[in-house]
Amino acid sequence: MDLILNRMDYLQVGVTSQKTMKLIPASRHRATQKVVIGDHDGVVMCFGMKKGEAAAVFKTLPGPKIARLELGGVINTPQEKIFIAAASEIRGFTKRGKQFLSFETNLTESIKAMHISGSDLFLSASYIYNHYCDCKDQHYYLSGDKINDVICLPVERLSRITPVLACQDRVLRVLQGSDVMYAVEVPGPPTVLALHNGNGGDSGEDLLFGTSDGKLALIQITTSKPVRKWEIQNEKKRGGILCIDSFDIVGDGVKDLLVGRDDGMVEVYSFDNANEPVLRFDQMLSESVTSIQGGCVGKDSYDEIVVSTYSGWVTGLTTEPIHKESGPGEELKINQEMQNKISSLRNELEHLQYKVLQERENYQQSSQSSKAKSAVPSFGINDKFTLNKDDASYSLILEVQTAIDNVLIQSDVPIDLLDVDKNSAVVSFSSCDSESNDNFLLATYRCQADTTRLELKIRSIEGQYGTLQAYVTPRIQPKTCQVRQYHIKPLSLHQRTHFIDHDRPMNTLTLTGQFSFAEVHSWVVFCLPEVPEKPPAGECVTFYFQNTFLDTQLESTYRKGEGVFKSDNISTISILKDVLSKEATKRKINLNISYEINEVSVKHTLKLIHPKLEYQLLLAKKVQLIDALKELQIHEGNTNFLIPEYHCILEEADHLQEEYKKQPAHLERLYGMITDLFIDKFKFKGTNVKTKVPLLLEILDSYDQNALISFFDAA
């Protein structure tokens, strides 16, 4: 059965954060529900639909930005009390809008996530978790990395309090009191947690989580260990998951899974006989989906998925059909309803046009006044700069609450801009004088009308580090622009991982000297992505990384006065040696640097590069042949005389050209890495082999793996 849902936009509030919209439970089954939402202006608004119009139940005065909104109440009763987290304060409202709670937590950081279960309140700021009962402090935990979400397994079903933290270092931490009972390693940084079926599933221990790289999974949190149930990979390369809900939208008696992503995608998964999720419906909205819930808002008896978006739109995807079939005599009634709606919209439009004219006149008068001061309009930007493991590129996502006019990208390090299918903006490049002003890239993206979200893909070169800047100009008057900066790190293509292969041939770099644990940690933060800014607890720490481009690995272990870095790639060790010695020199710290080079690792790295290089050379060769083969096809009329390999190239011509276009300079990047490997191998021996690089490039042009390995050995 196909699921058909029709979109209805209800109203727009201010910019919203993740998980800040809820539906208040209805008094009877499938009756219309009220929507409550909190925004960045600090306003909490509750509204319901009457005769197709949004009617406010209550609206609070502006205040600090609302980071979370949850519903609570006595356990096993309807959860209809509204709780909001703003700055370090929790406020509670009844469903009529009367404030009954104001609780100042005195946290040093702003609250980022909240969960409520009866009289228990679970809060997390960036690194700190707190548990309160009846507003009294119960438990506390300091996390090693940022906490993205917090939840507690249902107390009414398990008779124990089991909070779970979703942490940026790809770990779910299961707590007991103030201690970690156990940690669950997950495939990506978890961004959102939700109880399966809204109640923890059959066992009460089933927990859903979504990751920033778009994976979705179900896990059972038992008292002793986690049990993994299923995991959905992000094969369609969709956005990160921001919100999850369980609701029977299909109407088969089994709750479906509702998912909202940061690229605007709304998905519905049903469960098959084996309890595995199957995608039943998806729809793309134009901006990120911050909250999602199933219920009934627009009309009695019509179920719908209600979502809120970044810019504050509350939208319903409803089962109510747009085209209704009517019996005799009913036609007039439907027409009358439609006429009323059209008339109401017309009046609203006229009122807005009149208001715009008035404001324009006021602006003209005030701008001619000698006392007038020009005010720069403020606007919010939701941005995300993340490394994609699949293609070793960075995604830069810029989302603005109003339409974007243009975005200027400037970089002081060499980077490649890659093609993005979803991107409809027109890009133009300006010539740069990199020697005189450190500009390696100047590109302008001009957006089409009403574009509020822009996605770019960037590939950096390891060893070259600096800053990427985005100048975002929206379509507002007077013209104004915001600048966002993103650091390209020396080992920018490395990603945190839970395990590495210790049997690989490793090169070792050891640093010793008079430096503190915090200082060596700050150097590692400077060099590598996905390392927490605060030094972890304890005297010694180990991080594992994988190079997303080459699949080489890095182990980093450090403590006060000592740092040990191991990698199967000599170039990684060389970059670390150069950057760390430069950072130590800046701080006037004497470093003793020693290294052990494993000759076998060079051959091992070349073998890792081999399949990638071979594939890219073959792709380039095929693309070069396409034009000649097409010309032959036109001249000869048919291609029966061609060998099967050439037939295949002609048939796949469009796909091959698209793939080649998506990966500009891929071959040059691989050549560059092999050249760096060659130079670095001999640099550690104290030999300069730069004069032999032209010979190496000749060998690469007529590539043969054995010849290349022999050249490395003979040089």
From Swiss-Prot:
A GO BP entry? visual perception
Which residues are annotated with the PTM N-acetylmethionine?
Answer: M1
Q: What does the UniProt keyword field contain?
A: Acetylation, Bardet-Biedl syndrome, Cell membrane, Cell projection, Ciliopathy, Cilium, Cilium biogenesis/degradation, Cytoplasm, Cytoskeleton, Disease variant, Intellectual disability, Membrane, Obesity, Protein transport, Sensory transduction, Transport, Vision
- Where in the cell is the protein located? Cell projection, Cilium membrane; Cytoplasm; Cytoplasm, Cytoskeleton, Microtubule organizing center, Centrosome, Centriolar satellite; Cytoplasm, Cytoskeleton, Cilium basal body
Gene Ontology CC terms: axoneme; BBSome; centriolar satellite; centrosome; ciliary basal body; ciliary membrane; cytosol; membrane
Subunit composition and interactions: Part of BBSome complex, that contains BBS1, BBS2, BBS4, BBS5, BBS7, BBS8/TTC8, BBS9 and BBIP10. Interacts with BBS2 (via C-terminus). Interacts with CCDC28B and ALDOB. Interacts with SMO; the interaction is indicative for the association of SMO with the BBsome complex to facilitate ciliary localization of SMO.
Task of the protein: The BBSome complex is thought to function as a coat complex required for sorting of specific membrane proteins to the primary cilia. The BBSome complex is required for ciliogenesis but is dispensable for centriolar satellite function. This ciliogenic function is mediated in part by the Rab8 GDP/GTP exchange factor, which localizes to the basal body and contacts the BBSome. Rab8(GTP) enters the primary cilium and promotes extension of the ciliary membrane.
Protein known as: BBSome complex member BBS7
Q: Which organism is it from?
A: Homo sapiens (Human)
